[in-house]
Amino acid sequence: MDTVRLQCHICCSVGEIKNYFLQPVDAITILPIVELHTCRHQLCVMCVRKIAQRGRDKRVECPMCRRKNAHFNVYSVNRNSVDVLRCSVADVREHGRFGGLADAASLARGLFEPSLLEAEPAPDNSFGPNELQLVLKRLKAQIEAQTRTNYDLQLQATALERTIEEANDRLGKSRGDYSDACKLMDELRGDRLRAERAVKALADAHAQWADKNAKMRRENDRLTNENIGLIRDNNLFKQNTARKRKIAP
């Protein structure tokens, strides 16, 4: 992507960022949209200043989420380094006001005159052999670095896939073990219920036999008493018979 356009969600102003990847000279880029430090929502510095001016506690209330922010982040890109500046909302000041639209190039020329290049940069398509070699060298180095990164990512992805596969195998085994355990629990529960029913049946049978045994004991006692009475009566009968025989002439 050669150009990226960023828009402030409050004032709808647009900032354009060009890709200087193919430029032989290192370029410094300050991202035009800032990031609120607490809630991470983005807007432009002018909106930060205007919103902060309406408050009384030197903090800006985010228009998107209403969270208070005392700082905001500004991102700077230089070569292969991305730096972030944590700025205080209370320190934002309006530098000046113009009758029309402000000319950023003229403002930079006036404010940073000691940092101006003596010669204008060459047009985009007027690369010399040395510049082209430098660009190709950079491209080759970045391609090699990206290739190494891709290889490392591929190794990590392979290891991750293997780990996921092993985890899935363990999960499948755990599910099988859990299913077997559930089946065994069901079988044990069935055995316990059957054993409980058998014990209850035995208890009922024992109660029935105990009742019958008690009845038989009572009947045996009654018969024993009757037998004793009969024996006593028989003995008396024999005694009376013997006495009568003695008395008879």
UniProtKB/Swiss-Prot annotation:
SUPFAM superfamilies: RING/U-box (SSF57850)
Pfam families: zf-C3HC4
Zinc finger (RING-type): 8-66
Protein keywords: Metal-binding, Zinc, Zinc-finger
GO MF annotation: an example: zinc ion binding
InterPro entries cross-referenced by the UniProt entry: Znf_C3HC4_RING-type, Znf_RING, Znf_RING/FYVE/PHD, Znf_RING_CS
PROSITE patterns found in the cross-reference section: ZF_RING_1 (PS00518), ZF_RING_2 (PS50089)
Name the UniProt record assigns to this protein: Zinc finger protein CG30
